[in-house]
Amino acid sequence: MINYNPLLCLDFYKTCHAEQYPKGLTRMVSYYTPRMSRLADTDKVTMFGLQAFIKEYLIDGFNKYFFERDFEKEILPEYKRVLGATIGTSGVGKERLLKLHNLGFLPLIINAIPEGTRTNIHVPQIEITNTLPSFVWLVNSIETMLSCTMWHTQVSAEVGYRYRQIVNKYADLTCDDDVDR
């Protein structure tokens, strides 16, 4: 679980993207697509970890470390301090962050293939869309947090799948039952 402002878990260069989107843009759709496998000799990825990511980061993490904290006294100074020490504060976007803080929830819809599904590399597994027009910027902002969390759980799930294939193979060779594996 994160234990600090979740907005600091983002790619810092994305902090200024909101100002770069075309005026009048009201909807953003972004996809999480595995681009490669961390395992040799595989061209598939097991979709796994999204439900835990949503609960741990997007619900619990944002509630405890963003929405439930004082914006002016805690969130904004911390955010400015970290950005000021890295890429500068010109992209802080106080008004949009305050608007999100005052809203009290993440205005996002997340659609995905079922967990446990194996897909080919380069096949989108997750779709994220904003539900309120003024939060277009939020969609791509959480991508870093999502991808940093998902790759590890997906590699673990794929390793588990491979172990299961080995166990099934030898169970079929050595067991006297009619169980489909």
Task: Say what each PLM segment does.
Residues 1-181:
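Ordered alpha/beta subdomains of enzyme catalytic regions
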